[in-house]
A protein has these predicted regions:
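Active-site catalytic microenvironments in core metabolic enzymes, especially phosphate/sugar-handling
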Residues: 1-269
């Protein structure tokens, strides 16, 4: 009996239910067939051409990415422009592409919990809880420090442990006793955290005007590379997937693929 793409979709549904997905989040099988036999699985943040070529080189025919390839209807499917070029290449090479996005953001063991774990911190609760969808599920995590730490020192620790550049909004000498963590683009959680008397958020992709507002209001941001933060969930997903495969009696390779950040730090002020 062959392992199929449908079996992997069932696995994902069990470990990070689709009911956790944000409205209009295009999760699931985006390219390929549910009936296709699975020879090997690639886990990655983004379904890129590089990821596809690596999968082919490794003999893997299923890619499970965090980010979807398609968010909006495509206007063309050609080898010349993204994202159509990825779909074109995947179909040509017989690859199957699954995206499993916000369920991995919200599940209790997911993206933000993995980021906290990398920092050696224990989450107390989600920032935005969705207990109706399971205990501990929700967006982001809250952590408290037994002893306060200066924001600047915390930024240096984050840079070292996450292996990412870090931008900081706030006074580096500010004492931090609690922290919101949300892998991905979560600056919108600032207002919610302020209501919880938490004045620092570790996240990605903070816009200028949001940063300016935070600076004026005394709220702190630690901003890290989006891909670096979200890639930390992949080893946890791999572990769960290997357990699933072992119980089913399959010996299928599961490989993590990471790409360099598109951002390059040229000069520090």
């Amino acid at each position: 009996m062959n392992l199929t793409v449908s079996d992997i979709l069932e696995f994902l549904e069990n470990v990070a239910p689709s009911s956790l997905a944000e409205k209009n989040d295009p999760i699931g099988l985006q390219v390929g067939s549910k009936k296709a036999p699975v020879k090997g699985i690639l886990l990655t943040v983004d379904p890129s051409i590089s990821a596809c070529k690596f999968a082919i080189d490794q003999g893997l025919n299923l890619i499970v990415s965090h980010h979807p390839l398609f968010y909006n209807p495509m206007q063309s499917l050609t080898p010349d422009a993204y994202p159509g070029n990825v779909a074109y290449y995947a179909v040509k090479e017989g690859l199957n592409l699954i995206a499993w996005h916000t369920p991995l953001d919200k599940v209790s063991w997911g993206v933000s919990a993995a980021l906290a774990e990398r920092l050696g911190l224990s989450p107390e609760s989600p920032i935005l809880s969705e207990t109706s969808l399971g205990e501990g599920n929700g967006l982001g995590v809250l952590v408290k420090f037994s002893k306060s730490v200066k924001l600047g020192e915390l930024a240096k620790e984050v840079a070292k442990k996450v292996d990412s550049w870090v931008m900081m909004v706030g006074d580096e000498n500010c004492e931090v006793d609690s922290l919101g963590i949300c892998g991905g683009s979560c600056s919108f959680l600032m207002e919610h955290l302020k209501k919880l008397s938490v004045k620092t958020l570790l996240t990605s992709d903070v816009k200028y005007h949001t940063a300016k507002q935070a600076e004026i209001e005394g709220f702190n941001f630690l901003i890290v590379d989006h891909g670096a933060a979200e890639s930390l969930v992949l080893p946890k997903l791999k572990e769960k997937l290997n357990q699933f495969l072992s119980k089913r009696g399959f010996q299928i390779p599961v490989v993590i693929f990471t790409e360099k950040s598109p951002y390059k730090i040229i000069q520090e002020v």
